[in-house]
Amino acid sequence: AEHTPLAALDLTGRISTAGCSVNDATPALIKLPAAMLDHFGGVGKTTGDTPFALQLDCNSAVTISLRVDGAEPLTARGHGVLRNDATDDRAQGIGVQLLYHRQPVVLNHEMTLGSASAGRFTLPLTARYYQTRSRITAGQVSAVATYTLHYD
């Protein structure tokens, strides 16, 4: 008996690890509104709350942790404040505070955010100006933070 092939069957697949990717809707640059010096009233005062979100697309259920790294001013350590690194016409005594669910982000430290199922996971954040010294001057404010996501 002779056997003749009737059809060829190509099978392809992909094996991947569980994880998430940052959605294109996540902003890379956050612009705070202009603020007047009289909006501040002493060390620790804030203004210019600007909500934004890190949006993740997850391919399966995962536990997500976030680490935000950035330079903290000596006068505001432990308050989630990033140092003002503007190079031209820099405002003095002002930094940028990051909040997650209205609480200061602990910089340079990993925090567990919770579990995400497959699909979209949104991390609500806020950036705002934060007075770091009693004497402040007007000028530009620029801060940089690097975030790293870990998932299990």
Model-derived regions, located:
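Mature extracellular/passenger domains of Gram-negative fimbrial/pilin and adhesin proteins
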Residues: 1-152
